[in-house]
Amino acid sequence: EVWRANFRTNCACAGAIELAIHRDFDGTHLKDGCAKSVIDQYGYKRVGFVLANTLQMQSYDGRYHETNKRWSRTIFVPEDGGHRHTFLINSHPAILDGFVSNYRAELAKLHLFGAEHCEPNSGEQDFTGRVLVLSPDTLRESCWQPENQLWLASGGFGCRPHARGRSVFCTCLGDGETTRWNRSEFVGIIRDECIPDWAAEKLAELRQSQNAPAMGEMTM
């Protein structure tokens, strides 16, 4: 039943995209806010998933810009027994390509961290003591802010790349929350040059407190 409801919503989202394009295309270009109107109704994840499905299945079509095709390949869409065809978007590919660019521009306004901000070999590194980027897919969309994505790893078997355990214990640089995530829920280790000032300040505070002697402990 969950699958059926999810499938129906995908189909409805595809229809909403077609209607928005029909409404906002003036014969030359799409009006500003066309993609946002559908995002407000179905959310970033759903709209991105439905768009990626169409571009993946029509990857042969040269009317889609190569950068949009590459973007679509970053989203996993399961084969699902041939049901993918039922929520294809039937708008003109050249116009839909503009909608995809519009969607990606709206997504970029959130300033979320992604793989492009991470060290390329993150998957083979130990996470202990490193600042990690939590995948947006792990968070509710209401929490899609960069402040909720940066976490300082403190330990856990999942910190080691080939360990059997998955748990990574860490502290959020945004609000100081301490919790546990699975290693697979992180995009990777953020590159030092991509750490914003607010996060660098919080990181320095956390590391200073970790290195401070406990109360009553003698220092020399």
For the regions a language model picked out, list residue spans one by one:
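Gram-negative host-targeted secretion-system effectors, predominantly Type III and Type IV
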Residues: 1-219
